[in-house]
């Protein structure tokens, strides 16, 4: 998304990279006050997003199922999905319960140290597919 951190050239370059591996993308603007999308939403499965109230109201995810974060737990939006597991900050018990109630396998992760530098799980991770 277009934001203070990503301009149209960067977003266009990402879409071109996605095309080379068979994916498509769409450029959208982040809602006012949103640093970047991973700050306020995460893809939980092929049709469901975990979102803050602000992202739900933006209309960006119309057509998708949305699970809205409990008030006060907005930083929990930064979730990492690995296969069928969701890595979620252990600091947000209501979010963990909400995801569990919706049938997701949740792995709580301690994040106190990375939160001191205003980072989320995806900011502090490297993920790649193993080449077989």
Predicted regions: what they are:
Residues 1-132:
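Histidine/cysteine-enriched polar flanking segments
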